[in-house]
Amino acid sequence: MARVAVLVAGAVLAFLLAATNVTAKRWTVGDNKFWNPNINYTIWAQDKHFYLDDWLYFVYERNQYNVIEVNETNYISCNPNNPIANWSRGAGRDLVHLNVTRHYYLISGNGGGCYGGMKLAVLVEKPPPPPAAAPNKNSARRTFSVSGFAYQFLIPVAVFAAVGTRY
């Protein structure tokens, strides 16, 4: 029974230490206009912040366009040759996982789409740190953190449960 308590305490500790407040966002490229020609995707992206583990969701006419990743030079010249990645999966509903902090250069290499404006460049950044909690002037000076909780409660419980099994 005590071993179960140790396992439960360990599982709770692992869960609390792994929990984060950061969530990835799925961006529909072009919003309700989707991935189509004659849309300025530079303007669409200019007021957005793309963070690590966000997703770009491309919706387009599958028989006419595609989504490929190219280098900056090929992005500028709308050259689809030698792509870094082809994100098209054939259904016209493609996701690009922004899993590295860097520039991503995406174009449509089919149907002259890139020349019609179907090109998107985004810079992926690390997420900002969570905001610091404002101090409460009306209460005693107490702070709560996952690590403080772990050291003050979960670890003693786990130690007690482990020692309790020997006696």
UniProtKB/Swiss-Prot annotation:
Membrane topology qualifier: Lipid-anchor; GPI-anchor
Disulfide bonds: C78-C114
Lipid-linked residues (GPI-anchor amidated asparagine): N138
Signal peptide: 1-24
Keywords: Cell membrane, Disulfide bond, Glycoprotein, GPI-anchor, Lipoprotein, Membrane, Signal
Origin superkingdom: Eukaryota
Entry GO CC: plasma membrane; side of membrane
UniProt-annotated glycosylation sites, renumbered to this chain: N40, N71, N86, N99
Pfam families for the chain: Cu_bind_like (PF02298)
Propeptide stretch(es), residue numbers: 139-167
InterPro entries membership: Cupredoxin (IPR008972), Phytocyanin-like (IPR039391), Phytocyanin_dom (IPR003245)
GO molecular function terms noted in the UniProt entry: electron transfer activity
Positions of the Phytocyanin domain: 25-126
Cell location: Cell membrane
Family (UniProt): Belongs to the early nodulin-like (ENODL) family.
Purpose: May act as a carbohydrate transporter.
Entry protein name: Early nodulin-like protein 16
Gene for this chain: ENODL16
